[in-house]
Amino acid sequence: MSRKPLIAGNWKMNLNHFEAIALVQKIAFSLPDKYYDKVDVTVIPPFTDLRSVQTLVDGDKLRLTYGGQDLSQHDSGAYTGDISGAFLAKLGCSFVVVGHSERRTYHNEDDALVAAKAAAALKHDLTPIVCIGEHLDVREAGNHVAHNVEQLRGSLSGLSAEQISKVVIAYEPVWAIGTGRVAGAADAQEVCAAIRSELGSLASPQIADAVRVLYGGSVNAKNIGELIAQADVDGGLVGGASLDGEQFATLAAIAAGGPLP
């Protein structure tokens, strides 16, 4: 099956809502509409930027989509500081990131919570981008494939095959995030192929063949071409490079198969 590439720009805790508007305008200017026929492009801003991004995307009828960086497993209630999937859906979000390594590390989120958040996202017709990945010691010990397969199982626990068919998986080796180090294309393919194989066991081979698997970890315009050429890598979860509108547009154009804008 031919899977349409997805380029997702995770802005993390960067850019106020004025800066968000400027960046989306830059991306829109730098990446003409024709590219969106061949690649899906989404930005993942901080919560405080979402309404401004929504207004711009809707007003200018942009084909760019957007999403949230996290959500609560709860719909509403006494959960100070949390954001529900219902709120994100009301803002027009298409995607939401769950289980990012920074959430797992700094907020002690485990696989069970990630699975609950993925289910909450699906309940509100949001596509969860479920993140998994290993630390450097696991990679150096040669246990990276087994680690990611186990984390995938835990992070999708309780989801039906139909629900699994609606998720996106992002493999993000923790040692490569924001470090400038990037897993080689063959290394990324090794893990992404194992992810797809496990999805076949958890759901079905047909569903596994349709689910998009992204690579995340120091993705930029220089390495996206080689990464996305791999059989089981369907795009990128982009960090720092997504804050540069021109580079992000170039990256997306490469993922679309070119030519450069």
UniProtKB/Swiss-Prot annotation:
Top-level enzyme category: isomerase
Alphabetically, the GO molecular function entries are: triose-phosphate isomerase activity
Kindly indicate whether the keyword Nucleotide-binding belongs to this entry. Answer: no
- InterPro entries the UniProt entry points to: Aldolase_TIM (IPR013785), TIM_sf (IPR035990), TrioseP_Isoase_bac/euk (IPR022896), Triosephosphate_isomerase (IPR000652), Triosephosphate_isomerase_AS (IPR020861)
Q: Which UniProt keywords apply?
A: Cytoplasm, Gluconeogenesis, Glycolysis, Isomerase
A single Gene Ontology biological process assigned to it is: glycerol catabolic process
Q: Which GO terms describe its cellular component?
A: cytosol
Sequence positions that bind substrate: 10-12, 178, 218, 239-240
The residues annotated as the active site are 100, 172
Reactions accelerated catalytically? D-glyceraldehyde 3-phosphate = dihydroxyacetone phosphate
According to UniProt, this protein's pathway is: Carbohydrate biosynthesis; gluconeogenesis; Carbohydrate degradation; glycolysis; D-glyceraldehyde 3-phosphate from glycerone phosphate: step 1/1
Is Isomerase among this UniProt entry's keywords? Answer: yes
NCBIfam families from the UniProt entry = tim
The task this protein performs is described as: Involved in the gluconeogenesis. Catalyzes stereospecifically the conversion of dihydroxyacetone phosphate (DHAP) to D-glyceraldehyde-3-phosphate (G3P).
Q: How does it assemble?
A: Homodimer.
Similarity comment:
Belongs to the triosephosphate isomerase family.
Name-wise, this protein is Triosephosphate isomerase
* The encoding gene: tpiA
